[in-house]
From Swiss-Prot:
This is tRNA pseudouridine synthase B. Pfam families: TruB-C_2, TruB_C_2, TruB_N. The active site is at D48 (nucleophile). GO terms for biological process: mRNA pseudouridine synthesis; tRNA pseudouridine synthesis. HAMAP family: TruB_bact. It catalyses: uridine(55) in tRNA = pseudouridine(55) in tRNA. Transmembrane segments: none annotated. Responsible for synthesis of pseudouridine from uracil-55 in the psi GC loop of transfer RNAs. GO terms for molecular function: RNA binding; tRNA pseudouridine(55) synthase activity.
């Protein structure tokens, strides 16, 4: 018989991890889960191994609300290496073409403008999107091209930062599902020289502040120091977590009396005076305004529960 599976802690909250270079999002997720001894953990939108930056990790009950972060806007800083196009649109891909005739007359506002606003984007074959249960990148590595549907994306802001030599640096604020590598590949073709991503960092997810990010090194140091001093690291680790409702603070709040909240918890719709006319809401209970879940205001004005603690 195998050893019994150890149950983790019932710890709930959101950790803003500064994902390091070279590790997959799942790699760092598992490391964080072990360091916190958490029973459940999930990330909220993968970053490539070659990307760094903000990766919100939901622990425990917070995993119920991770979808709302998956659906949120993102902000990135990216450096495009002009003159070289690769099959993956990043630095570790195979070189497809190389051109020396790189235009240095300016930022080419027309090329940048063409990527601002709403558009349709075809995901890269070297992406984690799944086709028949298998990631697209697995097909690509076998030389198989799969038809992909274009998806609606929005680039809210595309800022020119600098252009030095063959490096063009941009900051991009975009909607969910936007592939920065695809934007850079398309931009390189519009500039007539080809391009790939040489550096990518996620600066922000939703409205989370970048100064609350922590690194794996910081987490590991906390655990190792506690072990050396023969004490628990849990209190110090838990202090780094943001509350569960931080994932849904963009939704308007509906505060319920405990007696009314009891009906909603049982799955019964209720009408609440002063609630928004429709849409998703963040539900709190009592004078303490304890977060208890997410609900939807239907067309008839009734509050229905969605994700619940």
């Amino acid at each position: 018989m195998g050893r019994p599976r150890r149950r983790g802690r019932d710890i709930n909250g959101v950790l803003l991890l500064d994902k390091p270079l070279g590790l997959s999002s799942n790699d760092v997720l598992q490391k964080v889960k072990r360091l916190f001894s958490a029973n459940r953990a999930g990330h909220t939108g993968a970053l490539d191994p070659l990307a760094t930056g903000m990766l919100p990790i939901c622990l425990g009950e917070a995993t119920k609300f991770s979808q709302f972060l998956l659906d949120s806007d993102k902000r990135y800083r990216v450096v495009a290496r002009l003159g070289q196009r690769t099959n993956t649109s990043h630095a570790e891909g195979a070189l497809i073409s190389e051109r020396e005739d790189i235009c240095h007359t300016g930022t080419d506002d027309a090329a940048l403008d063409s990527h601002r606003g709403s558009s349709q984007q075809v995901p890269s074959m070297y992406s984690a999107l799944k086709h028949q249960g298998k990631p697209l990148y697995e097909y690509a590595r076998q030389g198989i091209e799969v038809d992909r549907e274009a998806r609606s994306i929005t680039v809210y802001e595309l800022l020119f930062i600098r252009w030095e030599g063959n490096d063009l640096e941009l900051e991009i604020h975009c909607s969910k599902g936007t592939y920065i590598r695809t934007i850079i590949d398309d931009l390189g073709e519009l500039l007539g020289c080809g391009a790939h991503v040489s550096y990518l960092r996620r600066l922000q997810v939703a409205t989370y502040p970048s100064d609350r990010m922590v690194t794996l090194e910081q987490l590991t140091a906390i655990v190792e120091t506690a072990q050396a001093e023969e004490r628990s690291p849990n209190a110090e680790l838990d202090a780094l977590l943001l509350p569960m409702d931080s994932a849904v603070l963009n939704f308007p709040e509906v505060n319920l009396l405990p007696t009314v909240a009891a009906y909603v918890k049982q799955g019964q719709p209720v009408h609440v005076a002063g609630a928004p006319g429709e849409g998703m809401v963040r539900i709190t209970e009592g004078e303490e305004r304890n977060f208890i879940g997410i609900g939807t205001i239907a067309e008839d004005g009734a509050l229905h529960r969605n994700a619940w603690l």
